[in-house]
């Protein structure tokens, strides 16, 4: 609890100088949540940078990595809005990247029997090869970054993140 009090004090000391003065109470739970939010922002930036570095030799980017991964894990393809929902991005942003990926031969658009105007995104043979190449670098990276973290801690973290996503995704 002393570490929490020290962190809360540090955040209080920094916030006013950053123009973030607030009259709302600084409960420990609120401060922990805000610490979590800032940490997730930082983690996102680090994951994008790591993803770009990992995929560079494959001629890809972390944005393409995300799309390839989501489509590869779907059983029957996904629509652009479906990919956007999974990634928490706008449909327009996903449409831009999938259009470029289609031009580059990584994905193809196929008719959707469930919706005439919303086509399915599927991996081409080249896209499947890229996915397998990504797995060759992604799997050791994942192992390296989690080898000293107990599986229970990862499971608890995943449950918390999914719960917050569900709560915020309204």
Tell me what each language-model feature is.
Residues 1-58:
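N-terminal leader segment of winged-helix/HTH proteins
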Residues 33-55, 131-149, 154-168:
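Hydrophobic alpha-helical core bundles mediating ligand binding, dimerization, or RNAP-core interactions
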Residues 93, 97-100, 160:
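Residues within the DNA-recognition helix of helix-turn-helix
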Residues 9, 23, 79, 99-156:
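Charged, amphipathic alpha-helical coiled-coil/dimerization segments
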Residues 32, 95, 111:
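Short Lys/Arg-rich basic patches
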Residues 38, 66-69, 95-97:
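Base-recognition residues in the alpha-helical recognition helix of bacterial helix-turn-helix
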Residues 45-90:
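N-terminal helix-turn-helix DNA-binding core of bacterial DNA-binding proteins
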């Amino acid at each position: 609890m002393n570490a929490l009090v020290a962190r809360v004090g540090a955040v209080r000391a920094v916030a006013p100088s950053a123009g973030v003065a607030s009259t709302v109470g600084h409960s420990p739970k609120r401060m922990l949540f805000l610490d979590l939010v800032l940490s997730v922002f930082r983690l996102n930036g680090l994951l994008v940078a790591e993803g770009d570095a990992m995929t560079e030799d494959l001629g890809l980017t972390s944005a393409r990595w995300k799309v390839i991964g989501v489509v590869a894990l779907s059983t029957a393809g996904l629509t652009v809005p479906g990919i956007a929902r999974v990634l928490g991005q706008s449909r327009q942003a996903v449409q831009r990247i999938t259009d470029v990926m289609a031009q580059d031969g990584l994905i193809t658009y196929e008719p959707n029997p469930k919706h005439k105007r919303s086509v399915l995104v599927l991996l081409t043979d080249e896209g499947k090869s890229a996915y397998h190449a990504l797995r060759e670098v992604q799997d050791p990276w994942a192992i390296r970054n989690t080898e000293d973290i107990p599986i229970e801690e990862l499971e608890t973290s995943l449950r918390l993140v999914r719960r917050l996503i569900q709560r915020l995704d309204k």
